[in-house]
């Protein structure tokens, strides 16, 4: 369900890329409820996303709060690692491939999630397109003079990912990070890599 049905402002990816964005988070953590549809197959769960100095740890949980997969992104060496903890390993890998396609898309979609467009306000929703993706941002949660969307929806062909932000936090230094109880970025040594 959407927060507000006013017509969103349409922003091109080129304009978005050229923005000087005060909401460009270097260190950010958020938790969210997610709904994913791939064709007619649906999945609900939770997402816990921690980003610190260009490294992200994304934990995907099922509706019962059991971890099914962890994704690790590192912008410094353009690496993506996936630790699949589910019994349905092959199915989850296929779904992730369908959603993202390649590594470049993963990092661009991460930017689209972590850095909302400057046009997004409490009164103005935004719609942005990148390649085959349409990204809708609705509502904002404001903290420390920064905003983060309440709701993000990504659509591509027969894939829809809805992200309902529960809470988010940004911080400036390691001390603040540790006080908030967020874990350090540590990608496991033995991990499945399958996106090129």
Indicate where each model-derived feature is located.
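Short small/polar-residue motifs
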Residues: 12-17, 43-46, 66-69, 117-118, ...
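Short, ordered beta-strand-loop transition motifs
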Residues: 50-52, 120-123, 141-146
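Extended, positively charged loop/linker patches that create polyanion-binding surfaces
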Residues: 94-137
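An acidic-aromatic
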Residues: 53-107
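Non-transmembrane domains of secretory- and envelope-associated proteins
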Residues: 3-8, 81-86, 130-196
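Short glycine/serine/proline-enriched coil/turn segments at secondary-structure junctions
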Residues: 37-41, 65, 144
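One face of beta-strands
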Residues: 26-34, 41-49, 54-60, 69-71, ...
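N-terminal leader/targeting segments and the immediate start of mature chains
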Residues: 1-46, 187-196
